[in-house]
Amino acid sequence: MYKRQAFCAWQTEYLLKGLGPAARYVQRYRLPTEAEWEYAARGKDQNEFPWDNADVASGNGCFYANFKPENGNYTKDGNLITSKVGIYSANSNGLFDMAGNVAEWTSTVYTEAGVEAMNDINPQLKYNAAKEDPYRLKRKSVRGGSWKDPETYIKSAWRTSEYQNQPRSYIGFRCVRSLANTTSQKSTKSKKR
């Protein structure tokens, strides 16, 4: 299990410990799918960037996210590399740092077809590659761009891939939970008295 998945599992267990019987209704933390990530990043108006305007080209975009606004200029926004989480405004969904700062892992297997390859039968393109699997099966979709990327890479629709077992200083992750009101996959144990 990779560290990002292990953290989601730890965060779930931490939450469940304090909830008692109500824990069975809590959805587990996980990485978002690629489609979920893009929907969340675009905001309520489905913007090209997570904010409400396209000031990136004028150089004002560096005040909306931590990215490289000009060729070789990493510090125009005042941050040499990663910035403190939440210092830029939230998007219309109330989410911070959906572009720039660090790109983000998704749980979706990377394919050239992208979200067009998803359908009702396979909405997530999930596959957890084992160590012995060929490298081509170990690519995961990465979204959002990072502090080292130019404007093109921080658009909400931009996507790339990295090998799931290769950590990168410019890629982080975001934990999400589904909102469904169903019983959690982990059942609570009742004690006999």
Regions found by a protein language model. Give the residues of each.
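Functional-site microenvironments in short loops/helix caps that host divalent-cation chemistry
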Residues: 3-156, 184-193
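Solvent-exposed, polar surface segments
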Residues: 165-167
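Short, structured beta-strand segments at or near domain termini in extracellular proteins/domains
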Residues: 169-185
